[in-house]
């Protein structure tokens, strides 16, 4: 191939091709048409000779490359050129003569590739056949291991079953021995009973009817007490109904205190009749009946229905939570309206209501403890040796929650508020304005102590870290302040879980700037009747004496 290439490089036709093209280009304008055509044909003939030599060199080069080399180059570059560039017959003959070796080379390469593929498939099949026995052997060993493990597991389970059978046999023997001993003891008891039956048993026969009669008498006494309570309730309701029907409306304009005084007179008559009937029916068990002062105001009196004990704890809890929520949303706002007529500062009003709520819970819990002690003393003689004594005490308390002396608790709360240094204000204002609110909170707190577990309010102190789990900030708070300035409403807790969130006011730096030395507060004497004007402002000056400084933290 190298010799042919050297001959082509030194051939006259290849060397004179460039010179002829240059001469033709220079003489093209002066030559005639025939002369130009002759020049062009001469160049084509010379180029054809060069191409024939190049194809010979191409064939030799492809043969030197072997079966696989140069195939892609010929396919991608030479074949498209041959299809588009040469259309004349003479050139076609030359191409056919030169292309045949290339086609033979392509055919040989295809045959070679197919033979290589067949050899590869055959080698793969031989390797699979060789690896199949080893795979079968591995499967056999694995199945043998599984069989051995199953055998060991079955042996272990068999041993466990045998051990369990032995234990059951031992238990059966012990039970048989116990049964034999029981039969022997029963036979001995029968023999003793038969011996004792021969003795006179008049005394024993006389004791049994006495026990039955005493039980019937206790049951009859309880029924009579319930009947007396219900009859007193009925008579009180009938009397109040007759009074309301006999009372005619006045033609003139009524004063602002008319409806409130009328409601208080009705509640006073009802409470008086109920307390009188209960003191009559429970004279043996209750030594002190409820006091009925002229200023007694009962916010919500619940009838002592016998079905009260049957009410589930969940239903009572839901009702009390609803009452507590109503007290926050309605009764608290009413109390604020009353106090705002006398006090300008909203902070002082909210502090007064919060302290009243805390004191009411504290006093109600103390009253519940004393009430439970009295119930225990009363029920002890009739439940001696019984296992359900605590259940009986709880049922009695739930059934007789209306025996709670709420007015006495209201008086105690007002006394505690009078000596609290945080809410000292001018003497023209009296805490008797909050009697209805305090009485409602006391009744709610007293009833919450009868739940299982009881509900209580969370401890709160000014300056404590704000807890989002217990309180929500009021609308006028600084939402970036970390400390509580003062509390608006306490949080309701069940053990350590928050049932209802309270409300607190947070202000950054306000707690330290408003701290002032604690002054001695002036105690307020509490009279049964609170003289007030239209808005609860006292028109009669009352004597006040200095009292010692008390701890300002909330009591629980």
From Swiss-Prot:
Coiled coil: 152-184, 210-243
GO terms, molecular function: cardiolipin binding; identical protein binding; molecular condensate scaffold activity
Region spans: Disordered: 110-150, 171-214, 234-313
Keywords on record: Coiled coil, Cytoplasm, Developmental protein, Lipid-binding, Membrane, Mitochondrion, Mitochondrion outer membrane, Phosphoprotein
Biased composition (Polar residues): 129-138
Expressed in which tissues: High expressed in testis and weakly expressed in lung, intestine, and spleen. Not expressed in spermatogonia, spermatocytes, and round spematids in adult testis but specifically detected in elongated spermatids.
Biased composition annotated in UniProt, kind: Basic and acidic residues: 179-214
Biased composition (Basic residues): 257-283
Compartment(s) of residence: Cytoplasm, Cytosol; Mitochondrion outer membrane; Mitochondrion matrix
Superkingdom in the source lineage: Eukaryota
Pfam families, per database record: MIEAP
Low complexity bias spans: 113-126, 284-294
Subunit structure: Interacts (via coiled-coil domains) with BNIP3L (via BH3 domain). Interacts (via coiled-coil domains) with BNIP3 (via BH3 domain). Interacts with YWHAG/14-3-3 protein gamma; a protein that also plays a role in MALM.
Function text: Key regulator of mitochondrial quality that mediates the repairing or degradation of unhealthy mitochondria in response to mitochondrial damage. Mediator of mitochondrial protein catabolic process (also named MALM) by mediating the degradation of damaged proteins inside mitochondria by promoting the accumulation in the mitochondrial matrix of hydrolases that are characteristic of the lysosomal lumen.
Protein name: Mitochondria-eating protein
Taxonomic placement: Eukaryota, Metazoa, Chordata, Craniata, Vertebrata
Gene: Spata18
